[in-house]
């Protein structure tokens, strides 16, 4: 039943209070399996409706929507399957009871929103619904990231229900067409045979649907002698007048047309929303971290903030505490560190404890042991030079030992020593290549935290000079480099972003050349 915006928010709060999570959820992927079955079913239904349209059979308005927009279902289903991996889906909190028992909680929320909003998902209503839900119970970071995919899934399944009704209407229309032709033929040739066919129809369709009834009447409308007995049978069977029945059927088809139109429109609108901004507005963890005592966190770029949030997820999972509680502990730790050591401003920044040098201490305070892989990688980072050169040396020694031992075993010691020295350089080069390859494949890149001043501009405290090196070769080179510098400046207009050239002369046999002063003057003038 469609609800008003206020009713939707109240419904969201009731949902949050009613939902119970499964403490030991089954690690299944039935949601993804359902989505694949839905996608295949809608594809087949679209094919059936297209075939009916090709044969010039009448179709309902809802069926026309499916024929014109069926590709949206296919594309959105593929997008969900691509982004909602099985592993990620298995990590989402699962409901312990109710209509969506055994399914992710965020999926149940999405289904409720879609069904009670009549498939119409405006950005404001969406935000209000999830904020109302979280006023009673917070969602996890993973659940909030899954919201767009769950909304798409809920919309696809709702469109499937409407497509099933449209397909049923289509088949009932074909049945009505079949019986109407038989009744009309009998009425024109042998009126006595007409009633035997009507009796056969009553036996075959003991409880005709309203759509079948209205379609049958439409076919018989111009044949009064056939219409009257059929109308009498239908009114007696359905218990209402055909006028009322026709009004109800028209109302149903109109409502289904509106609903399916809303569904396809919402699928398009979901693709246009900035889900990063929506996520950060809904995330309780984000709201806590933005209280960073150093005031740095809100100025970080999105990827760096996301690294901080992922760390919160990891500690929450290993400690068994809620993500919001973990974020609050980070905030408290940063606040305390800022008061105790005012000269070390960086310790009052929450990022220091999540992605910086304070992470080990925070893990100890949380009584969370870091995963073995993470500890191993951090150990390698701390001893990078020793690890690198020892690995190169070990691989070189191993390769030389194998070559000498198996290839030169019968030679004298002097020959072996001489050949070993000759092969030392190529073998060490091979070792460098192998170790460099392994480093790039096994060690994740160390991404530096970044600031984002795209909207506010670079503040005075971060005034920056970009220095571009160049050689004073000749006048043409200077002119080209100055033009490039001008392009960089025009492409990055900011009062606190400056550009300069760092120049030097080319190599020469003497300390000074005749044109040094001229080239310098040209560079300054330009």
Identify what each model region corresponds to.
Residues 2-103, 128, 132, 145, ...:
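ATP-dependent phospho-/nucleotidyl transfer catalytic cores
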Residues 65, 95-105, 125, 147-155, ...:
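Secondary-structure capping and boundary motifs in well-ordered enzyme cores
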Residues 75, 102-144, 151-168:
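Active-site activation/catalytic loop segments of kinase-like enzymes and analogous catalytic loops
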Residues 78, 82-89, 98-112, 364, ...:
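Active-site-adjacent "gating/activation" loops or surface patches in catalytic cores
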Residues 119-122, 136-140, 406-415, 460, ...:
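Secondary-structure transition/capping motifs at alpha-helix termini
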Residues 152-162, 374-436:
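Alpha-helical bilayer-embedded segments of polytopic membrane proteins, i.e.
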Residues 167-168, 408-410, 430-453, 479-482, ...:
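Juxtamembrane/interface segments at transmembrane-helix termini
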Residues 187-313, 317-377, 446-526:
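Internal catalytic domains of large membrane-associated glycosyltransferases
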């Amino acid at each position: 039943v469609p609800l008003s915006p206020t009713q939707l928010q109240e419904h969201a709060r009731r949902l949050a209070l009613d939902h119970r999570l499964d403490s030991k959820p089954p690690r299944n992927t039935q949601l993804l399996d359902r989505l694949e079955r839905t996608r295949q079913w809608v594809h087949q239904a679209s094919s059936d409706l297209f075939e009916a349209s090709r044969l010039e059979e009448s179709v309902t308005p809802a069926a026309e929507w499916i024929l014109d927009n069926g590709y949206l279902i296919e594309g959105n289903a593929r997008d969900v399957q691509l982004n909602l991996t099985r592993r990620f889906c298995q990590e989402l909190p699962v409901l312990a009871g109710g209509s969506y028992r055994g399914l992710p909680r965020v999926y149940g929320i999405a289904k409720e929103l879609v069904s009670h909003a009549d498939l119409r998902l405006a950005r404001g209503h969406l935000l209000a619904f999830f904020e109302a839900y979280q006023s009673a119970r917070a969602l996890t970071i993973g659940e909030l990231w899954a919201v767009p995919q769950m909304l798409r899934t809920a919309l696809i399944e709702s469109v499937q229900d409407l497509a099933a009704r449209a397909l049923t209407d289509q088949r009932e229309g074909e049945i009505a067409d079949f019986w109407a032709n038989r009744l009309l033929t009998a009425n024109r040739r042998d009126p006595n045979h007409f009633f035997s066919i009507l009796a056969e129809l009553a036996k075959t369709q003991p409880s005709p649907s309203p759509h079948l009834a209205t379609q049958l009447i439409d076919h018989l409308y111009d044949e009064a002698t056939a219409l009257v007995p059929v109308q009498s049978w239908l009114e007696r069977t359905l218990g209402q007048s055909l006028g009322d029945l026709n009004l109800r059927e028209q109302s149903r088809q109109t409502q289904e047309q509106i609903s399916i139109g809303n569904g396809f429109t919402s699928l398009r609108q979901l693709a246009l929303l900035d889900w990063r901004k929506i996520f950060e507005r809904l995330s309780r963890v984000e709201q806590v971290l933005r209280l960073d005592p150093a005031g740095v966190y809100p100025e970080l770029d999105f990827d760096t903030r996301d690294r901080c949030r992922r760390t919160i997820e990891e500690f929450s999972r290993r400690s068994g505490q809620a993500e919001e509680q973990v974020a609050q502990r980070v905030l408290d730790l940063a606040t305390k560190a800022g008061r105790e050591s005012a000269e070390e401003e960086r310790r009052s920044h929450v990022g220091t404890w999540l992605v910086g040098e304070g992470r080990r201490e925070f893990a100890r305070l949380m009584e969370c042991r870091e995963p073995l892989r993470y500890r191993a990688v951090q150990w390698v980072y701390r001893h990078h030079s020793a690890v690198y050169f020892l690995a190169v040396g070990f691989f070189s020694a191993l390769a030389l030992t194998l070559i000498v031992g198996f290839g030169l075993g019968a030679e004298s010691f002097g020959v072996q020593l001489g050949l070993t020295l000759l092969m030392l350089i190529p073998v060490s080069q091979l070792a460098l290549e192998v170790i460099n390859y392994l480093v790039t494949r096994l060690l994740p890149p160390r991404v530096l935290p970044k600031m984002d001043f795209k909207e506010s501009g670079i503040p005075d405290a971060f005034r920056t000079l970009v220095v571009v090196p160049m050689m004073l070769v000749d006048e043409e080179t200077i002119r080209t480099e100055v033009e490039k510098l001008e392009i960089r400046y025009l492409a990055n207009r900011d009062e606190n972003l400056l550009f300069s050239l760092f120049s030097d002369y080319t190599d020469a046999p003497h300390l000074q050349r005749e044109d040094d002063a001229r080239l310098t003057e040209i560079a300054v003038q330009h």
